[in-house]
């Protein structure tokens, strides 16, 4: 079957990462994955959470969608006086994904908050937030290195994420909203640059799926993540 935007089944949407989009944040970027656009900023504070051992740092994330990021306006979380359950789940995922490649002892007594604000959502907002959030975090670490706040980069590698799914029994990479909403199976994958899995979230939306189908989706994601990490490298090396 042909895809909505004419892509091959194993092809990413057009990806662009624009660094240093916010002059006030220690690190920032705008990531565009097709029609999904996410603003990612990294803020540095010298107050790690209380649960963190003395001398260690922490990386956390917050995620939200602008009211008109989708086809219809949604209410802001603040107007409901509570965090949307979906947003809470996604920001925990982003934080876990980024912490997986951070050496908290090398980070030292610093708290890094990654804010991911979806300007426009067309599927894959959580995975775009992880991919862009990593770039924002690395730019913040660079600024900290220049200021003498870090002795070395406290990361073990790159991290990126992408989705895949089965639509009309066909495995596809990087689903847009229309594909995602009609997918039989939906899977999100986070990996480091050594091909190691950090998190896999798979759901049988319309039917159960086999281990072979899951493996095919993970392989599609691995291909896409390698390409995303090359984009991350080019952006960070050009700075």
What are these regions (language model features)?
Residues 107-122, 162:
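Catalytic-site beta-strand/loop segments enriched in glycine and acidic/polar residues
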Residues 85, 106, 124-128, 137-142, ...:
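A structural signal for small-residue-enriched, beta-sheet-centric alpha/beta enzyme cores
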